[in-house]
Amino acid sequence: LDYNKLLGRDPISTDLNTIQDYIKGKRILVTGGAGSIGSEIVRQLVKFGASTVTVFDNAEASMFHLEQEISRTFSKAHIKYVIGDVRDKYRLEEVFDSFKPNVVFHAAAYKHVPMMESNPVEAIKTNVLGTMNVSNIAYMNEVEKFIMVSTDKAVNPTNIMGATKRIAELYTQFLETKSATKFIVTRFGNVLGSEGSVIPTFIKQIERGGPVSVTHKEVIRYFMTIPEACQLVLQAGVLGNGGEVFLFDMGEPVSINDLAKNLIKHFKSKAKIEYIGLRPGEKLYEELLCDGENMVPTEDHNIMKLNHIDYDFKTLIPKIEKLSKIRSNDFYKILLLMKSIVPEFKRENND
């Protein structure tokens, strides 16, 4: 399956030499390193000559499979596989003490919108408090750069997952104001072929003979392939001087309805499309910029930098502390607290 043909565009290319020059010889930590994005970041870091890559993840099966693959492909790679959770700051402190990373790529997160609507406290624990743990320890250890993998769903969020990622973005920008560590945020859209994403889901439905579930005929999304997304994250890490939010040129948004039709045609299937309606927290289209943000070009034409927006960081920490103390899925209380941190957070398609 040619993903770029499916997207109707050429692959996005970036300057691999500048990435290699920066990565070579570095000690690097990748949180969520066994996931779809994290594992590809790990592969590319090994290719670019990182001296040591520490893979940190709580998914032991995925970690095992990655270890088996890497040992076959890169027999001399210096990789450490560490089971742990970003919620556990003591485990993270051990990792930083043991491996002393120069650079951190933070990819650990919960990403599934409907699942997080049902489990908002878990989204807060991982996406907000987990990011705080990793970034705080990076700050205390004076790590050179901290690159957070974020999402376009953090822009004017309409769901719990997007709101938690926006809060995490804000926290890293707060740390940037008082840190020697350069904190950098990267935002991109849906990643083709990642675990649980639309393409694998559609393919499974087609293999079963259908129906293929599309939420709405007019839904459009921005897409990138996994290698594209990871190379651009690495390049943004090279370009970043701290405090930036980087946005990638993902081409034109893609109709999910057309994507389903093209896949059915590709597999010569007779499966029908079933329109199931937008799920809680979903939009017809994703936005690229928060209110008040403007894009500025960088030296890489595939990457845009967003200007800073004013935010009262003095109020951020007390509000996050209140959020962290919620122990039950008290949806109304969670929504009110999140909206006090992210005023542009507006619910859609909910009771």
Label for each model-derived stretch:
Residues T31, F56, V104-A108, F146-T151, ...:
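SDR active-site strand-loop-helix element
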Residues A50-S51, N141-K145, A180-T181:
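A short helix->loop->beta-strand "cap" motif at the edges of active sites that frequently abuts
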Residues L1-K100:
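N-terminal Rossmann/SDR dinucleotide-binding element
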Residues H106, Y110-E169, F174-E176:
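Conserved Rossmann-fold NAD(P)-dependent oxidoreductase catalytic core, especially the SDR/UDP-sugar
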Residues A50, F96-F105, V113, V143:
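Proline-aspartate-enriched helix->loop->beta-strand connector
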